[in-house]
Amino acid sequence: MDPCECAKTGTCNCGGSCTCTKCSCKSCKKSCCDCCPSGCSKCASGCVCKGKTCDTSCCQ
């Protein structure tokens, strides 16, 4: 089973430790997803998890 179903459901569970919602990621990284949700500007380091959720404040 593909651990990242963002393309289908808009929700991505990465390694069971992080959830990325409202995004269009196509694959997952260990830290979370290789995308930032809408409203979260993309940063040089990508989308960084704060806690167990990637949200509009995920980018540092």
UniProtKB/Swiss-Prot annotation:
UniProt: a divalent metal cation 3 binding residues: C14, C18, C23, C28
Residues holding a divalent metal cation 6: C36, C40, C43, C59
SUPFAM superfamilies (alphabetical): Metallothionein
Binding site for a divalent metal cation 7: C49, C54, C58, C59
Region (Alpha): 29-60
GO molecular function, one term: metal ion binding
Residues given in the record as a divalent metal cation 1 binding sites: C4, C6, C20, C23
Residues the entry annotates as binding a divalent metal cation 2: C6, C12, C14, C25
Residues the record lists as binding a divalent metal cation 4: C32, C33, C43, C47
Residue ranges, annotated region (Beta): 1-28
Keyword Metal-binding: yes
Family affiliation: Belongs to the metallothionein superfamily. Type 1 family.
Name of the featured protein: Metallothionein
Gene: mt
